[in-house]
Amino acid sequence: MLEALILLSFTFYFLPMLLAILLDSKLGDPTILGHPIIFFGRLIGWGEKRFNRGKYRRLKGTLYNGLLVGLTLFLSWYLLEQLLNLGSIGQMVALILATVLCFYMLSGKTLIDEVSAVFREVDRELEAGRRQVARIVGRDTAQLSAQEVRTAALETLAENLSDGVVGPILSWALLGTPGILTYKMINTQDSMVGYLNERYRAYGFFSAKLDDLVNLLPSRLTALFLLLGAGRLDLTPFVLREGKKHLSPNSGYPE
């Protein structure tokens, strides 16, 4: 009985993520099929257009975006649970679906490819490097030096390693496939409405704070992994000290 439970746990819990990591390392972001993040973005954008106006914007943003987070967690869990109860065919569909969804939520290879392209281009020509890094950063790159282009690319790699790899895998470890989907919904909300400007300050307040919360551990684990990879654990006090100085409670640690 115990052996059967272990096999079942491996097959329907661990195997989808292992396969997803393998697929991501070989293929990167899939481009043939529609991406779930695009669907998330449409839902978030629909609500923003309708509710980010007039009075009570913070309340409306909290209710709508909180509802999206809750529905993502519940519906993904419910769908997989129902499939698992349909016998061997349903279980196979659940396994494939969980694998594909986890694969879609990872962006390790794509991130590495983008940063590698920046280094190749800046080594070839500074202006080409500026154009390439502009694809992955939100700042003005027109006046960056070659070293600043490389630094910007590495900072983006560090921060997005948390959002695109460590955070999703940790969320999956805690709550399975529903967890990784919910994490990416929160992350997508923050990237769309979690800003401090006049338009989003009130409406995106909940999304920004929730994203800060769910990334507290991933950001610090990412920093630890980077220090381990570089063999520089002696820099831990520096990272802990300087990370606190960033405007974001999380971004400063991996950067």
Residue ranges and their predicted role:
Residues 191:
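RNA/tRNA-interacting regions in translation and RNA-turnover enzymes
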Residues 1-181, 186, 194-255:
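Hydrophobic alpha-helical transmembrane segments
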